[in-house]
Amino acid sequence: MALPQSKLVCTVEQYLEFERQSEERHQFIDGEIFEMAGESLAHSRIGTNFIRELSTTLRGKPCEVLSPSMKIRSGPHIKGMRNTKGLFSYADCLVVCGQPLFHDDHKDVLLNPTVVVEVLSHSTQSFDRGDKFRRYQTWNESLEDYVISWQTRPRIEHFQRRPDGKWLMEFVEGLESTLRLESIDCELRLSDLYDRVEFPEDLPEEEAQFPIGSPPSY
């Protein structure tokens, strides 16, 4: 997801009231509201491809894909008007299995995602791999798969929660490869996930130092 361009300080309830009336999307991080920046064509295509492929695969199954307009809460549910703690974020694609649980009766803030997909951008990589993922790990116990998709090459960082609660990370790269999501019994071909995506001949400097098969820095 795109990172903030501006910020305000407020409570959770103030944020939700503001966000539900706003034409733009914003994330909430411990009392600060961050406006979401725009996304590239490649970013949009990858996110749309994930939604299409997962929706087709999960048709008739107990799991469903929710739109990128659904927020995710990662933090304590503290009643009262002064609560400023927690993360309210958006994903490029998300899956929930079983009965969705929500923050309130508006049913626009999900508590129990099973799969979260983020399309990596230069401005978001530290947040998506760092603080955002740590909060998901801590507060969203339902989360089984966290998927980070690069947009400059056919490469995916897949984090899977193991039965002991620890996370296993694997790289899936190359258009001939397949991403396996055990939690929803699903296999996705990277050639489908990167359909219509054009990759740059020259990688950004911070990515060029990581050739295929090597891990990025965290």
Regions found by a protein language model. Give the residues of each.
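Gly/Pro/Ser/Thr-rich low-complexity, intrinsically disordered segments predominantly at protein N-termini
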Residues: 1-218
